[in-house]
């Protein structure tokens, strides 16, 4: 295979695609370079599909190699381990726009692997990874309705930034990734600083327009490489069986989809499906391969899809009886757990999230070591989706890709309103436990987390709410749905999640399964989402509309003080012995900054004040004329040495012990005795002279 190379200018960066030199046994492979960021993206597809498979087994793996940043992995084995959260999220980011471009009925197993070989700190890896995946699939000849482009968009000073660097993103009010084809936007993932809907939509359109140069370059690159296309035909529909299924099941299915309660509806649909199989087996008894369950299931699913969609497009009530704009009934409770620092129970229809906020010290921050460098994460968000929340039995293990993705979306939504560590000295962990799910559990997590944070006394800028929107579109007819159910998400054409405050959008996520989504449709979806979001906020605000005035008594209590930086060594002690003794005695965590700022985190105010007193004693300067209570540590013929501060001793001369003449010091003092003394002199060498007789 000849080496093929294609270079084009993409914003401020030059992008290069190469094929024919690396990974030549893969079905398709591309080395993509953007700045000094280099990735190898490979795709391998099985030639034959597994018989009876009714889904498309696409796997996307994004992996970062530490050598890409000139680093050696930590740990005992010194090699990369299981995927990090960033790797999982980037894998999902690549997967989401690719999946809808594979043709319906294509069920061959496909694996895309994007490996980071070199990383440029100015160029995030996700955009070249998506571009490389698009090019590699195009080269492979697999059935694919591409090419796919991607762009990152920032917003600063009223202007959009194309593919901003990591440094530019720090000053940007927006971090938005958009992917799509020449004619359609397919995926959006974003975080924003309470921006108007018009700015968000403008960013999506700006990114889609800007990515056209990348889409064109990928198409030219694939054409130049000239790979052979797969000979693949979509499975034919058994029209006779289709007609039979419709006759048998359409009427009962329509009736079933009028059952508003999810579990009862699913049970009825399963009963119809089981009866259909039994009827088919009875009619074809004695025939070889009498019942093709896979074929029957595909037709039955298409019938379900048509019934639900027609019902909505003809203006009939939705599955649960609502119109297109109505949000399900909402109930809100806060402070539901007695020993947590903050908690909320948010229920919207048959979706319920129990969200808990825990406040910790700086030592509780999450340490992250990846290709971007070492850093501390002070705001942690975890989302859990146990099997019981959908009435299923399932294997309990670590978080799955979906849970990590939903948790990150909810985190994006609330991060813009959460104070930084310098304004609120706590590390914050939020956990969302999904207890019931029938659509939009990530947005329930957003609402619940906002309430739980305020219940914990975290001074958030404003309450945040989220809503999931859907779309049903057939030709020129369409309906935008507010607060979608799980079935509407599954059977619809778009999943469009918007979160924000009353002032603007903080997070936007969009996944579109079809082409033909116009600017007008997206505008309507955003406007309708705003209406729903404000409605949800109004209900939340009736229960809790601002943060508690103080944090929970159960949370760590912070005491902050400042000392002379030269005294830090006195507080720490040799080998840390002094500070360790203070923390053990007072049950506190103590953090000392180089500028002398000390933060004491205690379980109670009393423990914090005790630690503060100990440090004040250690770092106090002796004051001339001040009376101290000290302990006699040594007696000599000429006087006694008295410990007046932890690191300071002074001499009480024999002439300063009493008003009368003292012949023997031991007649008046003994070692270990506690006495009151006055500082009468501090000489140039810092030596302290004390007096007992000059005390009034």
Curated annotation (Swiss-Prot):
GO cellular component terms given for this protein: cytosol
Cofactor: Mg(2+)
Name of this protein: Polyribonucleotide nucleotidyltransferase
Record has RNA-binding as a keyword: yes
Keyword Endoplasmic reticulum: no
Positions that bind Mg(2+): 489, 495
Subunit and partners: Component of the RNA degradosome, which is a multiprotein complex involved in RNA processing and mRNA degradation.
Source domain of life: Bacteria
Organism from which the protein derives: Coxiella burnetii (strain RSA 493 / Nine Mile phase I)
